[in-house]
Amino acid sequence: AASDVYKRQDLEDQSFAIKLFRQSLMKGSEFRERINKHMKNWETERIANMDLIIMQVALAEIMTFPTIPINVTLNEYIDTAKYYSTPKSGTFINGILDSVVNELKKEKLLLKD
């Protein structure tokens, strides 16, 4: 029945959200360290908190869910930043996350495209 499909999808969405939230918190300091390393000429205090949170959650998604392509994740979080943060946040976040992703690939910690 259609209601079973919706219930199953709700459970999958709920499981995804919980796993993403958990990874964002558990590996938050590791993600922030990587983000900080790529923020050339920027002090963390000058960055919008929302931008840091968005980048942290994006990295959690990239590192935790191998079936979601990197460009899909990046596009989603860049759009999120444009909507919930400052007008320039999308470009800023794109640059930082792209740098972090390239570093993770070089370190062989990220094995997807």
Task: Give short role names for the model-derived ranges.
Residues 13-35:
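Membrane topogenic helices and adjacent juxtamembrane segments
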Residues 14-21, 51-59, 97:
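Amphipathic alpha-helical elements of HEAT/ARM-like alpha-solenoid repeat scaffolds that form extended
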Residues 71-76, 80-113:
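Alpha-helical oligomerization segments
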